Amino acid sequence: IFSTEFALRLMGDVQEYFIAKNVRNFYSVSISGYHIAEAGANPITQLAFTLSNGFTYVEYYLSRGMNINDFGPNLSFFFSNGVDPEYAVIGRVARKIWAKAMKNKYGANERAQMLKYHIQTSGRSLHAQEIDFNDIRTTLQALYAIYDNCNSLHTNAYDEAITTPTE
């Protein structure tokens, strides 16, 4: 919708406002990998591109003179989930990579090193032809997310593959 330059500038303006007004415990941006996975990426590719996008924000904010410890805690992530085995650890792997990079490359404090993430179960895993099994698919994906210690979770409705979800 927007050019990359405009989007980064807009997000930078929002983040500068958050810092100036001391807005805490509210996420200025949710760095999303959900759409990447729903477009066909496997879990490893989703993670790689999402973290890359996150580091793009970090580098841009730093280039505008913001302090890593001022904006780091305001970043969150949004991942898709599926039944591939890698989904059982996507959050743990993301947290480890993020924390190490934030500490070792950027000198971030503990709070800024924390990766907070939301999981939504995969819409593309739901089938119109086997709709009765969609609840099972979603349940397995939700269990992966819970066992991986996600911060928040959205589960899709069983009929999301064929219509606007009912419940």
What are these model-predicted stretches?
Residues A48, A99-K100:
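Conduit-forming functional cores of very large proteins
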Residues W98, D148:
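Conserved, mostly hydrophobic/aromatic
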